[in-house]
Amino acid sequence: MITRRLALLCSTAVLAGASSALAQTRRTPVAPPHPAASRPRREAAPTGSPADTPLGPVDTAARWAYIQDFDTGASLLEKGADEEVPPSSMTKLMTMYIVYERLKQGRMKLEDELPVTERAWRMGGSKMFVQVGSTVKVEDLIRGVIVQSGNDACIVFAEAISGSEEQFAELMNEKAKQIGLVHTHFRNSTGWPDPEQKMSVRDIATLAGRIIRDHPEFYHYDSETSFKYNGIDQANRNPMVQKGTADGLKTGHTDAGGYGLVASAIRNGRRIILVLNGMASMRERAEESERLMDWAFANFEDVTLFTAGDIIERVPVWLGTAPTVPLVSGRSLMVTMPRNWRQRASVKVAFATPVKAPVAKGDVLGKLTLAGQGVPAMEVPLLAGADVPKLGLPGRAMAVLSHYVPGS
């Protein structure tokens, strides 16, 4: 077994003797696409225990926090990420996920009119102000939920889809299991206070990511800054959407859970999902979400170590029709790294040599390992990039003879 270390040079990682470049990185200077990004840098607001990050502890005013890279799924910051806590109006993400799924399946249309019951009309909290006995277009209800955080609009959807909000909550729980939410339980469609209504901030981030990934054709509603219905114009409650520093998703507040927010932003082609909960005020929520979103973009980058089919090394073949076989990656590999990752990362390839013919394209011949402080540890199989048939009998005889006879 031979093990070789990759040398990480500039924007590529090159194995001595290898011909292909590895590790092309996004090197564009990170800058938010909005003038608000030029605001003075905020210092951390230390409150309680700090959050865990690959770079070490980071203070945050949030009681619960989770930040994730959308493309790689890498966890950039965690604080109580799996604790089951009141999700407040961030619950509405699941209501909308189910609505979007119905629309995509053709079981509901944007122009459909849904009836408003007295229960929906009487619902307290944040409202779209639908009128009892009327009907409302699905598209208006979507904006009523996302922009205005309308509890009444959620009830209209729940009753239209499942007959009652109680039955709709059962559907929400089924969907939560299907998409991998493990610290979530729903009792209603709105996030109205209920001691059994729980979500972890990691689950909220997962749900937000599924909305963006599974239903991109509907995600544009999240970036709308206001919506007027029934003569009442209401602004989007998400402070980051209002400032143009995020393109979604939802805020929330309950007495038990405090002020929360799930937001997503894309800068220079890289998307981050941030979830904070348990803050003391709207102002603290706005400032902390901006600060930590900036921190995530400033301190990490997405690095493509290699793409599918890249030749990592050439391995000698014994008794084959070709002297070597290319060792290739079976898939593209992009990871999220600290920005000084070249000083932290250790990348090695290991393979047995020589390989005995015949070799079939796709055979696993070695592995690549990635490790280092703050670097996600992983192991990737390396595959034969071509078929190498076995030599015929005369060829094998000559190869054996040349191997054992000096000077031949």
State where each predicted segment sits.
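Hydrophobic core
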Residues: 14-16, 368
